Amino acid sequence: MKYFSFSFFLFAISPMVLADNLTQSFQQSKQQFNEFQSLNQNRWIQQHSFQFITQQPKNDSLSKACLNYQGIQFKGVTLVKADHLLPKKEECINEERLNQLSQQLTQEYIDKGYIHNPFQFEDDHSGLLTLHVFEGKTAALESDDKQLNLNQLLPNVLGTPLKVQDLDQALDQANRISGNNVTVDVLPAKNGEIRLSFSNELTSRISGSIGIDDRASKNYGRWQARAAVNIGNPFGLSDTLYLSGAHTLKSRYQFNRSLLLHYSLPYGYWTFSSFASFSQFKSPLILENFSLQQNGRTVQAGISAEYVFHRGGNHISTFSTQFEKLNSKNRLEDVVLALQSPKLSSISVGINHLQLFENGNLVVDLRYEQGNNRGQEQPESQFKRSNLELKFNRYQALDSELFRHSHQLTGQYASHYLPSVKQEDLTGYNRVRGLNDLNLSAEKNLISHNDIAWIKQTKIGTFSPYLGFDLGIQKSVNEDQREKALAYAIGLNWSYKAFQANLEWATGRLFDKSDGVKQERFISTNFVYLF
């Protein structure tokens, strides 16, 4: 196989021009992976609602007359520290004080996550009143769905005190599976123990979508077809299998296509995943007097582990680590372009936090990646980068109308050269809109993507007209060049049963010191059928 960077024959061709198609091809794979992550996040948000703090009602009918007890003692209390709740010496013990003690002790257990701890008062006529707590331990797991693998969802829970975090985590893992709608009843057993009875209103194990849009590059004729399939519990391990693909529709001689396969396996607070993606393109490179055929492909595979290290009624925080390998090969005719053919291996760590509010939600994602580049004739053999993503959605009611504010902030920082497949995009549908044919990416960038939508329910579906505004800035480490971009857009989303559609008109402007101001307008459409 012949390798070269640029011969005299191609001296006038910019390396960025040669890299554009490879970058566009890999963008398709990145978009599929981002859609999969957004699908899981949105599913979690839809299944949870903001939990308000409830106040215990005050009972004014309780007697304040002192009872004939010298004090109170606890029995069976091992999971919380509660001695500070006991009445002080010579304090009046009455019905009101006993009710207060019961509520305070219950709250101590709830604050620690223990939700089933029945108790009773016992009088042995010694002058001390005993508050006997039966700390609920899990005695049995039951389910009306034999395909629900409870050992994967609640490992090592039998014989241990039940925590609400364990139960919430198990329900989250179960309801990530396509077609599942799992609920649980906490039922009493013997000696204060409990049994957990799971119920599943199963629909279909297979779900997915088929769609078409015109958001591909002009070079590929705009139109592309997309499809995704989500298979729940394929191996009976409460696991999920996700497959998605996209293909431009111009011709078989000039195309961009990609495929993503993702598999995840839950185990309590852990989720283990593996994935593989493939992207490929073919396109002519038009020169002044002739044209050359450019083609390339990128193969990516990896494994990851995610651990939920903290969760509450309105939030969930996870730590994740991922190892991946990526191999790109870009050819001009039968010659491999070494600079645009990196071979990468990397490891990354990240923290994700998802927070619910009364009328909105926030997603924070921080990630650091470090890796090696073993491709030939690469500028640097190692790379490092840090990424930030913030998503905030808020619903606001004005009189009888409902509005949604959607804001996304993404950023990347790298102090040294990054291969093009690891650079972040400045332009695109989910970045700065309207500039779809300007493929701009760099090591450092910051982008704000914003929409305000009016949500209107009608007999023929939900209509959401919206206004959009984007801002972005990027800088390359190899060139003293900085680009700025802004865009404004107007669009309409529509959904009815299994059908979804989008129409958007966007204007983007690029500010460059060397080339001045460039402006593009882009009208895009998207049609999706869900099954």
Regions found by a protein language model. Name each.
Residues K2-L10:
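Sec-dependent signal peptide recognition
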Residues D20-A216, A246-R257, L409:
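Periplasmic polypeptide-binding modules associated with outer-membrane biogenesis and secretion
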Residues D451, V477, A485-N493:
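Short glycine-rich, acidic/polar surface loops and turns
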Residues S495-F531:
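Predominantly the C-terminal beta-signal and adjacent terminal strand-loop region
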